[in-house]
Amino acid sequence: MYAIVKTGGKQYKVAEGDLVKVEKIEGEPGSSVALTPVLVVDGANVTTGDKLASVNVNAEIVEHVRGPKIRGMHYRNKTGYKRRFGHRQSLTVLKVTGIK
């Protein structure tokens, strides 16, 4: 059984026991989080729409990490303007504990 869940504006395919890196979710490591299911597949049975109200996808926060550094640069022609910058996204590692 697996589910497609939505968090942080993105969708992730998860199964029970999976570790998933998602956009940062507030909470302490060890605390539980409920994720919003978009689709649930159990063998040949596919659950979508209004039937998802009875489906719960629970996960546990494992840790908060930061993603890889992304370097960028702004450049304006003929003016001598150059600007370099870097960015590291804050992520949360979740362990899916149950799809019911």
From Swiss-Prot:
Q: Which domain of life is it from?
A: Bacteria
List, in alphabetical order, the Gene Ontology terms for molecular function in this entry.
rRNA binding; structural constituent of ribosome
* Cross-referenced InterPro entries: bL21-like, bL21-like_sf, Ribosomal_bL21
Q: Name one Pfam family in it.
A: Ribosomal_L21p
> Which SUPFAM superfamilies does this one have?
L21p-like
Gene Ontology BP annotations: translation
Which keywords belong to this entry? Ribonucleoprotein, Ribosomal protein, RNA-binding, rRNA-binding
Q: Single GO cellular component annotation?
A: cytoplasm
| Family listed | Belongs to the bacterial ribosomal protein bL21 family.
How does this polypeptide assemble, per the annotation?
Answer: Part of the 50S ribosomal subunit. Contacts protein L20.
Q: Which HAMAP family match?
A: Ribosomal_bL21 (MF_01363)
What the protein does?
A: This protein binds to 23S rRNA in the presence of protein L20.
Name used for this protein in its record: Large ribosomal subunit protein bL21
Tell me what organism the protein belongs to.
Corynebacterium jeikeium (strain K411)
